[in-house]
């Protein structure tokens, strides 16, 4: 009944992906895959169309530029002012410096982080 293979296609757009979007894309893509000859997937497989997720990684400068205005989590190679992880709104990114507005206890603060200092960055969910 189940298949051993999964063809996973990640889709995204600026306004975000809905469940309806993934269903429509699945209905468009599936028949197109069946028309390819020779069949690149001769064994049974499951087609999975999904979005990268709410807390997707931001691995490139381009993905960080696209995330300006979003709430993010950034881990650093070395601490800045004794802090190694920042979570807040990405206010700006010019390719070299990330500017993040974050909450330190009850006060808003802004930190400028060199892009080279970023070990990991991802979108985050604001609670």
Swiss-Prot record:
Family matches, as SUPFAM superfamilies: YhbC-like, C-terminal domain, YhbC-like, N-terminal domain
Pfam family, one: RimP_N
Keyword flag Iron-sulfur: no
A single cellular component GO annotation: cytosol
Cellular localisation: Cytoplasm
Highest taxon above the source species: Bacteria
Keyword Cytoplasm among UniProt keywords: yes
Keywords, in A-Z order: Cytoplasm, Ribosome biogenesis
Chief location bin: cytoplasm
GO biological process, one term: translation
InterPro entries referenced in this protein's UniProt entry, alphabetically: Ribosome_maturation_RimP (IPR003728), RimP_C (IPR028998), RimP_C_sf (IPR036847), RimP_N (IPR028989), RimP_N_sf (IPR035956)
NCBIfam families for this protein: PRK00092.1-2 (NF000928)
UniProt record similarity statement: Belongs to the RimP family.
Purpose of the protein: Required for maturation of 30S ribosomal subunits.
Protein's UniProt name: Ribosome maturation factor RimP
Species this protein is from: Streptococcus equi subsp. zooepidemicus (strain MGCS10565)
Upper classification of the organism: Bacteria, Bacillati, Bacillota, Bacilli, Lactobacillales
């Amino acid at each position: 009944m189940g298949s051993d293979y999964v063809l996973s296609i990640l889709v995204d757009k600026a306004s975000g992906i809905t469940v309806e979007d993934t269903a429509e894309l699945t209905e468009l893509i599936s028949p197109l895959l069946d028309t390819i000859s020779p069949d690149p997937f001769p064994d049974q497989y499951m087609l999975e169309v999904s979005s990268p997720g709410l807390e997707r990684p931001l691995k490139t400068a381009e993905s960080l530029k696209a995330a300006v205005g979003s709430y993010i989590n950034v881990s650093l190679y070395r601490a800045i002012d004794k802090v190694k992880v920042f979570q807040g709104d990405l206010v700006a990114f010019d390719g070299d410096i990330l500017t993040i507005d974050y909450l330190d206890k009850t006060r808003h603060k802004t930190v400028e982080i060199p892009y080279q200092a970023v070990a990991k960055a991802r979108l985050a969910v604001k609670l």
